């Protein structure tokens, strides 16, 4: 017992404090539970924002007694800072992959333009070969010229085919990069959901403990259940221990016969 506020034969009113119990242990346990719960609630708010793609952290309902405390403000500041850092990191990571895809697409467009130019040259060569073959058959041109044109045409065909292979390989790289981006996004989401599930389970456990601690704190103050006169006081020593089954005192309503 921390303090005894009444003596034998005192008159008391309903709700008046009779005895105060030492709450050192209970209050320490409550503060410890409260601190852990605050950290978990702030963490949950961050994870929900990350899961939903939000920009701000919002605390869940049901813990208003903790919402406006300095400890909660500090915890939210910490989690908001972490949220911004993780958000920026993911944005940078995804933008790097997006930029890689854009660069590869630009390479494909360049190769496609080269291919179109080579195909135009190939078409012109076909026409020129036909014309020179006609001249050769008439004896007006050398066959050497025709052979040179055909070698050039073969070179163009090889270049066009090589570009086609390069385009196909680059398209594969684009697909791989897109899959990498999707995989990283899925991995990030799975990690967020796993951490969120674990955090919410811990909140459920600690919330029960916190409510139990608050209930114990309320019972540190023993009040008069009704108005009357105090008799049979058995609690006399500050620092003494109360046994649950032992009465501390009796209160007899005024006017009742003892």
Placement of each model-derived feature along the sequence:
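Surface-exposed patches in structured soluble domains
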Residues: 216, 223-258
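Short helix C-cap/helix-to-loop transition motifs enriched in small/turn-promoting residues
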Residues: 9-11, 39-57
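Long, charged amphipathic alpha-helices with heptad-repeat/coiled-coil character
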Residues: 74-218
């Amino acid at each position: 017992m921390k303090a005894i506020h009444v003596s034998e034969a005192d008159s008391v009113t309903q709700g008046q404090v009779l005895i105060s119990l030492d709450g050192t242990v209970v209050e320490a346990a409550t503060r410890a539970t409260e601190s852990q719960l605050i950290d978990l609630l702030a963490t949950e708010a961050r994870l929900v924002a990350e899961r939903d793609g939000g920009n701000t952290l919002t605390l869940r309902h049901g813990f208003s007694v903790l919402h406006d405390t300095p400890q909660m403000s500090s915890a939210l500041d910490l989690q908001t800072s972490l949220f911004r850092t993780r958000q920026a990191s993911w944005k940078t990571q995804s933008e790097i992959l997006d930029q890689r895809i854009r660069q590869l697409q630009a390479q494909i467009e360049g190769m496609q333009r080269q291919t179109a130019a080579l195909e135009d040259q190939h078409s012109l060569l076909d026409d020129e070969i036909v014309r020179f073959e006609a001249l050769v058959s008439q004896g007006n041109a050398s066959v050497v010229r025709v052979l040179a044109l055909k070698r050039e045409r073969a070179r163009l065909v090889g270049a066009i085919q090589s570009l086609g292979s390069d385009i196909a390989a680059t398209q594969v790289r684009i697909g791989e990069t897109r899959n990498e981006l999707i995989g990283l996004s899925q991995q990030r989401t799975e990690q967020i959901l796993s951490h969120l599930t674990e955090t919410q389970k811990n909140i459920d456990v600690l919330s029960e403990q916190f409510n139990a601690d608050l209930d114990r704190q309320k019972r540190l103050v023993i009040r008069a259940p009704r108005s009357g006169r105090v008799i049979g006081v058995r609690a006399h020593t500050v620092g003494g221990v109360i046994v649950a089954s032992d009465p501390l005192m009796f209160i007899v309503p005024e006017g009742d016969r003892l």
